[in-house]
From Swiss-Prot:
PANTHER family referenced in this protein's UniProt entry, alphabetically: LARGE RIBOSOMAL SUBUNIT PROTEIN UL30M, MITOCHONDRIAL RIBOSOMAL PROTEIN L30
Underlying gene: rpmD
Protein's GO biological process: translation
Protein name, per record: Large ribosomal subunit protein uL30
Domain of life: Bacteria
Gene Ontology cellular component list: cytosolic large ribosomal subunit
Family: Belongs to the universal ribosomal protein uL30 family.
Length: 62
């Protein structure tokens, strides 16, 4: 398990046009709204699952 203060940084690298509505909602839930926007979130299993769901749209920076 990860420590409580570890973070994961995400960047939206592909457009949401033509994607499923549930994937768009997941990207918004991750705090990303436009291409190249960056969000820093706690590294939890829930966030990891969201990243896995939209892995073709986002890039993990750190």
């Amino acid at each position: 398990m990860t420590t409580s203060n570890s973070k994961v940084k995400l960047q939206l690298v592909r457009s949401l046009i033509g994607t499923r509505e549930s994937h768009r909602a997941t990207v918004r839930g991750l705090g990303l709204d436009r291409i190249n926007s960056v969000s820093e979130l706690e590294d939890t299993p829930a966030v990891r699952g969201m990243i896995n769901k939209v892995s073709y749209l986002v890039k993990v920076i750190g």
